[in-house]
Amino acid sequence: MTDDLIKKAIGETIGELSATSGEEIYVVEAAIRAGGRKIELTVDTDKGVSIDQCAKLSRAIRARLEACEEDSMLSSGEFDLMVSSPGIGEPIQVQRQYLRHLGRLIRVNYLDEEEQPKEITGKLLEAAVGPEAEQPSITIEAVKEGRKKRTAGEPPVTIRLADVVRAVVQTEL
C-alpha cells in the first residue's frame, strides 16, 4: 500500500512540475526500500536536470507524501527521500537519454550479429528512440584512443538498442 502511494505521489508531482516548467521530467531510476522509509529517485530531462530542479522536485514530493493521511509513516515524515540526476559515468538506463547525449563521446558494450561481445568508443551521431522508432538504435562514429580523440576513419556503426549491454557517456577533457 505504501509503495503504491509513493509511486502515485511521485508520478503526480512530476506531471505537475513538468507542466508548469514546460520541460518534461522523466524517471531514470526509482527505488523504494525499507517499507517506504527510503526513497531514491533519479530523474532527467532532455536538456539535463539541475540541482535546483532536483531540490524543487524533492520538496514537492515530500510535501505531497506528508499530506497523505492514508499512511501514518508518510504523513509524519518518517522517511528519507533522495532526488538526484544521473551522475557522470553512470550507464544510460532509459532510451530517451541517448537524445540528450548526441554529439558526445560514448562507450558501448554490445552483442554483434553473432552474439559476440563487442565494445566501441565514439561520437554518438544518431539515436532512433521512442514510440516512432520501428527499430530503436544508435549510430556511433568510432574514435581512436589517445590524448587527442579523432575519428578512426571507419564508417559509422549502427547498433540496435536491444543488443546494447551497457552504454556510458565518457568525459572529455
From Swiss-Prot:
GO cellular component, one term: cytosol
Subcellular location field: Cytoplasm
UniProt superkingdom: Bacteria
Gene name of this polypeptide: rimP
Disulfide bonds listed in the record: none
InterPro entries documented for this protein: Ribosome_maturation_RimP, RimP_C, RimP_N, RimP_N_sf
Protein family: Belongs to the RimP family.
The name this protein goes by in its record: Ribosome maturation factor RimP
